[in-house]
C-alpha cells in the first residue's frame, strides 16, 4: 500500500461487497535497497528515511509535482521517490533549488529485485541525464541521499552502472 493503488483497489472491492486479502511483504524500496546494496539509513549519513511519490494525479499536464521540497532537501536522510521516472528532471531540479547539494549521491533502480534489474548511480545533478542515457523506464525508484554513496555492490553486481560520482 505504498503509493500503489492497493488502498484504492481494496476500497473499491469493499464497496462492491467483494472480500479481498492483503498479504504482508516488503516495500519496493526495501527490496531495491537489499538487491543493490544501497543502505536506506546509515548511522554516519542518514538517520531518517522518507518515501515520496513523483507522480500525482493531474501532474502529467504540466509536469509539476507538489511536494514539500524544503523538507525533502534536508540533510541526514535518504529520500526514495516512487513513480518518478517521468518527473525525474523536475524532482532533481527542485531538490537542488531547495538546498540539496548537486553532489548528493543518487540512484535510479529499475525493475528492482527482478533478473533484469538495473541500478544507475550518479548524483542529484547527473541522474536525469543518466536516466535518459540508459533509457530507464518505469517501474523504477529514485534513491537520493548520502547513504546512497555507501552502496556495497552485492555478489555478482548484475545490472550495476556507475557514473563515478
Where would I find each of the regions flagged by the language model?
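Active-site nucleophile and cofactor-binding loops and adjacent substrate-binding regions
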Residues: 22-28
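Structured adenosyl-cofactor binding patch, chiefly the S-adenosyl-L-methionine
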Residues: 29-40
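A contiguous loop/helix-start segment that scaffolds small-molecule binding in enzyme catalytic cores
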Residues: 4-12, 18, 46-48, 53-165
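A short, small-residue-rich loop immediately preceding and capping a beta-strand
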Residues: 1
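Short beta-strand/loop turn elements enriched in aromatics
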Residues: 38-43, 98
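Hydrophobic beta-strand scaffold residues
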Residues: 20-22, 40
Amino acid at each position: 500500500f505504498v503509493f500503489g493503488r492497493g488502498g484504492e483497489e481494496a476500497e473499491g472491492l469493499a464497496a462492491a461487497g467483494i472480500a479481498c486479502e492483503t498479504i504482508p511483504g516488503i516495500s519496493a524500496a526495501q527490496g531495491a535497497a537489499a538487491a543493490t546494496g544501497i543502505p536506506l539509513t546509515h548511522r554516519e549519513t542518514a538517520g531518517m528515511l522518507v518515501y515520496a511519490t513523483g507522480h500525482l494525479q493531474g501532474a502529467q499536464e504540466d509536469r509539476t509535482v507538489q511536494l514539500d521540497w524544503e523538507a525533502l532537501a534536508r540533510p541526514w536522510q535518504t529520500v526514495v521517490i516512487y513513480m518518478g521516472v517521468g518527473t525525474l528532471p523536475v524532482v532533481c531540479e527542485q531538490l537542488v533549488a531547495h538546498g540539496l547539494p548537486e553532489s548528493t549521491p543518487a540512484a535510479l533502480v529499475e525493475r528492482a529485485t527482478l533478473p533484469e534489474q538495473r541500478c544507475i548511480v550518479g548524483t542529484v545533478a547527473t541522474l536525469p541525464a543518466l536516466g535518459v542515457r540508459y533509457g530507464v523506464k518505469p517501474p523504477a525508484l529514485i534513491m537520493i541521499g548520502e547513504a546512497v554513496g555507501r552502496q556495497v555492490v552485492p555478489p555478482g553486481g548484475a545490472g550495476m552502472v556507475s557514473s563515478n560520482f
